[in-house]
Regions:
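Basic, alpha-helical helix-turn-helix
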Residues: 15, 62-63
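Short alpha-helical elements of helix-turn-helix
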Residues: 4, 10-16
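Base-recognition residues in the alpha-helical recognition helix of bacterial helix-turn-helix
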Residues: 20, 44-48
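C-terminal regulatory/oligomerization modules of transcriptional regulators
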Residues: 1-2, 9, 21-35, 40, ...
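Beta-hairpin "wing" of winged helix-turn-helix
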Residues: 51-62, 68-69
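Helix-turn-helix
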Residues: 40-41, 65
């Protein structure tokens, strides 16, 4: 199986749409085919990528394949988002400190 990151997998609009539907609740391939403007084989390929990224898992129930969210890929996605947020907060803190220093220097120059 090819290794693909959750971020890469969600880079495709059709996969994002499928993922969002599964996020709202487990569903069958038939239900997923009904929500996107692509063929059933194309949906199956998109679902394969989501499985490879560990964002979804599949369970066979009789003749149907039911897709569920996979906590493994979601945890990786969360770690990535948290690292981005930490970078944003650090940059914000640095900018705020820089602006405070500029204001202080400006205030000293005005005296």
């Amino acid at each position: 199986m090819t290794n693909i990151s959750p971020i890469e997998a969600l880079g495709d609009p059709t996969r994002r749409q499928l993922f969002e539907r599964i996020r709202r609740g487990s569903c069958s391939v038939t239900e997923l085919v009904a929500i996107v403007p692509v063929s059933q084989p194309a949906v199956s390929q998109h679902l394969k990528v989501l499985r490879q990224a560990k964002l979804v898992r599949v369970e066979k129930q009789g003749k149907q394949r039911i897709y569920h969210l996979n906590p493994v890929g979601l945890a990786e996605l969360r770690r990535y988002a948290e690292s981005l947020w930490e970078d944003v907060l650090q940059a914000f803190g640095e900018k705020a400190e820089s602006m405070a220093n500029e204001m202080e220097e400006s205030h000293i120059d005005d005296e």
